[in-house]
From Swiss-Prot:
The keyword Repeat does not apply. It is a single-pass type I membrane protein. The lineage of its organism: Eukaryota, Metazoa, Ecdysozoa, Arthropoda, Hexapoda. This is E3 ubiquitin-protein ligase Godzilla. GO terms for cellular component: cytoplasm; endosome; endosome membrane. It catalyses: S-ubiquitinyl-[E2 ubiquitin-conjugating enzyme]-L-cysteine + [acceptor protein]-L-lysine = [E2 ubiquitin-conjugating enzyme]-L-cysteine + N(6)-ubiquitinyl-[acceptor protein]-L-lysine. A zinc finger (RING-type) spans 235-277. PROSITE patterns: ZF_RING_2. Residues 1-21 form the signal peptide.
Amino acid sequence: MSKRSCQILTLLGLCLVCHEATLVGGHVLVYRKATSQLIEEFNDLPAQFGPNLPSNGLKVYVVPARRPYYGCDSLDRPPHLKYPPSAKFVALVARGECVFERKIRVAQNASYSAVIVYNNEGDDLEQMSAENITGIRIPSVFVGHTTGKALATYFTTEVVLIINDELPFNINTQLILPFSILIGMCFIIMVIYMIYKCIREQRRLRRHRLPKSMLKKLPVLRYTKNNANNKYDTCVICLEDFIEDDKLRVLPCSHPYHTHCIDPWLTENRRVCPICKRKVFTKGEARASRSRQPSLDNVTDTDDDTTPLLQQQQSNGRQVGQVSSASSAGGAAGSSSSVAAAAVAGTTRHGTFRRGHAGRNPFEESQSSDDENALLASTVRPATSSGAHERINPFDRAPNLPAHLAEQLTESRRSVWSRINFASFFRRQPAVISVAAPPYLERVESGTSAMGLPVTGTIAVASPASNNILNPNLSGSFKDEDDMPPHRSIYEPIAISTPAADSATVDDSAFLQTPTQGGIGVAALPHSASDRQFLI
């Protein structure tokens, strides 16, 4: 239970007490007539109907009702002969047998000035009410059972009653015990909570302070002037120069201070050096273990000012195997697969990729430039000897192959169901666009046909590392990406038909050009092992 809950419960208890106090509308005072001495005082509660009591009270003599004490049928008239002529009388009747309204009307008809109704069971006070208040001209009050029995004993000319509607301070005795328990529980909970907070605060302060027992283990030296080993001549706490034979306490960081300056700082403030903020540990003191979570945001309290902000990246053999397999698959599948392999390998906190030397892609090394090979060779040698991971440039070039060539180079073959394009049955077939071959291609083909050479064949593209034909070691292309149609590449062959010597039609896909522009260069190279000729 929090402190706020205790306050709410206390407020509710006070409201209940105030509510009970407001129900006590006045009291009945018992005086001895001869001496005007107050004998006893009782609490009462005025009724909701009838006239109000006078401000200075109503002075009356009590007359109890005869058996059965309810006063529902009739009441004896007041005994005026024994009392003074100006005396007023109040009828004392018990609760029950009839409604309050009937009791008041019967007493009014019997010439009584007021009515006191006492409870038949218990001392609880209840505010009387009536359905028809017409014709009621006398006031009435309600008292407890004990009060009614006590007032019946004052049926004498020597005792007079004064009934008023003052609001005395009164607390119902039935609420004292629950209210006391409530206040006591709130107080105990508040004390326990404050003790807990104090202990926690003391532990926190003690953890950041140096105990006095440990303070004695720090060395104390005497200052000597003109000493070559003195690097500091001023105490940074009091800003006073050291004088001869001063007691200086030297911290583990080699910073000296006056003993009367640094001792209160370490024992009452924090156990850190005021200059370098290094935590002070004495000789032989056990240091708390530094525990960090993988997240940099979760730092324990045991970290001091010398704790590195970036922890070393943890790696294991399983990650090395994943990197090797992912790198070999990525060299065949293109840039998208290489990036996925790099993601599996993980990156450092500085953004550089890691990979193992055992799983290096031979295709990437064969397609790199001489400078890059020299750089990689210089970084591979120490990694090979130590067997650890090496860092490479995050912008390391990866093969950029078209999707269909990357699929041809992968070892895994697609299933029969994956080769079927079900979407083609539900969409319209695009119109076939025929791209005519340039004139120089026709002249070359006519020359080869006249010489009796066979028709041109198809040359396989051997794992190019870039889409630049002039220099495969350079990544990129001379074409703008906006000019390239989606899912097309300069390596995509275009089937053309050339007449052969025997009027046969053979598909030729050796000529490489884009669908929108002409080829960059065309050369007819004879093949040494056969009589076929290839166009590059």
